[in-house]
Amino acid sequence: MSRVSNSDNYSLAGQQHTVLGSGRTSSLLWTSNPGSHFRSETRGNGRENGQDRVKRPMNAFMVWSRDHRRKVALENPQLQNSEISKRLGCQWKMLTEAEKLPFFEEAQRLRAMHQEKYPDYKYRPRRKAKMPQKSDKPLPQTPLLHCAGRRTYTSTSGCPFLIHGRLFLRATQSQTGGAVKPFAAGATAISALQQELSQQHRTLRCHSGNVGYADIRRRSLSL
């Protein structure tokens, strides 16, 4: 049961528990002042820090739709609440300024009463929880090589290396321990490239098609 502080003007006259659609309990607190009958709502999950949540005063449209919503719901029981709101919105727009005037005056009167009862009231809209954004970028399947080059080719074994670049670097798996052994630039890298080509039948699968061993060797020596 919610705790309500004792006051000279207000006291807890009754408390009624209801269950909301989301499964949370809601307490309806009514004051002893027969002239106000103001209803405040508290959530059972403690989000309001145990304090009563003061509802905003009704505007002109809410005052007008208070009775019309009930009428439309009785005439069309199959309609959802959102559809009823759309119909009421269209009907409200079709009214003339003279027809809307009494409801604006009533809304102004309710706003003045609300401000008199709750002078420190400030509207605090509830913020929606932000969902974490999922990244659509796929994870790299091959080891990343930080090299200065223009083209990247992939051999039949799946190991990438660079052609037409200043450095020839390649990551290979050791057959004994499985550790990655980097090759230095220059002649050592060219020798490693030749061994790779001979082991893979001197063919490579490139982005533009198959490139033979002689073509790769000619490009390497031209640097």
UniProtKB/Swiss-Prot annotation:
Transmembrane segments: none annotated. GO terms for biological process: cell differentiation; male sex determination; positive regulation of gene expression; positive regulation of transcription by RNA polymerase II; sex differentiation. Acetylation of Lys-130 contributes to its nuclear localization and enhances its interaction with KPNB1. Deacetylated by HDAC3. Residues 54-122 bind DNA. Residues 23-35 have a biased composition (Polar residues). One of its GO terms (molecular function) is calmodulin binding. Gene3D superfamilies: High mobility group box domain. Residues 38-55 have a biased composition (Basic and acidic residues). GO terms for cellular component: cytoplasm; nuclear speck; nucleus. Keywords: Acetylation, Activator, Calmodulin-binding, Cytoplasm, Differentiation, DNA-binding, Nucleus, Repressor, Sexual differentiation, Transcription, Transcription regulation. It comes from the Eukaryota. PROSITE patterns: HMG_BOX_2. The keyword Transcription applies. Its main location: nucleus. It is found in: Nucleus speckle; Cytoplasm; Nucleus. Residues 23-55 are annotated as: Disordered. InterPro entries: HMG_box_dom, HMG_box_dom_sf, SRY, SRY-related_HMG-box_TF-like. Belongs to the SRY family. Transcriptional regulator that controls a genetic switch in male development. It is necessary and sufficient for initiating male sex determination by directing the development of supporting cell precursors (pre-Sertoli cells) as Sertoli rather than granulosa cells. Involved in different aspects of gene regulation including promoter activation or repression. Binds to the DNA consensus sequence 5'-[AT]AACAA[AT]-3'. SRY HMG box recognizes DNA by partial intercalation in the minor groove and promotes DNA bending. Also involved in pre-mRNA splicing. Interacts with CALM, EP300, HDAC3, KPNB1, ZNF208 isoform KRAB-O, PARP1, SLC9A3R2 and WT1. The interaction with EP300 modulates its DNA-binding activity. The interaction with KPNB1 is sensitive to dissociation by Ran in the GTP-bound form. Interaction with PARP1 impaired its DNA-binding activity. This is Sex-determining region Y protein. It comes from Equus caballus. The gene is SRY.
